[in-house]
Amino acid sequence: LDLVYTAEIREKEGGSYGVNCSGSLSRYPKEQLVLQIVFQTDPAKKDKLSGIVIEQLNKMAKEGPSAEHMQKIKEYMLKKYKDAQKENSYWLGNLDEYFYTGIDYTKDYETLVNSITAKDVQEFLAKLMKQNNEIQVIMTVPEEEAK
């Protein structure tokens, strides 16, 4: 999604310097997934750009990512994984997870990443979008009072 929004929002529309997409999963207190898409823009462009965000999410849920994007994403994930292994926080987080859940996230990571297909991403996003569970937050700076 970062690649798509960089092309659409930043390069094509000139609407923002960058768009940040992030996701998180949690098990407790209940299982949930959060997908956040955050960007700053001119207030006059917020409606148009918000529409593009939803349009591109729906497109990805229907068509999936391109082969080029999949390759770039996998390369990035594997690089971040190798870099993370040099950090104590990576190992502490994984030890903590293993202690509490018994799940070893360090095992077979590269194999898992390489096994993900564009169809997997498309189907996952399609299921997510079918939930119709969206919250849109728009924050603006109040206009200065006329003096």
Placement of each model-derived feature along the sequence:
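His/Glu-based metal-binding/catalytic segments typifying zinc-dependent metallopeptidases
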Residues: L1-L3
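M16 family metallopeptidases and their MPP-like homologs
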Residues: T6, R10-S115, N133-V141
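Intrinsic-disorder/low-complexity regions
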Residues: K119, Q131-N132
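Low-complexity, intrinsically disordered Gly/Pro/Thr-rich segments
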Residues: A118-A126
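A short, acidic, flexible beta-alpha connecting loop/helix-capping segment that sits on the rim
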Residues: M129, T140-E145
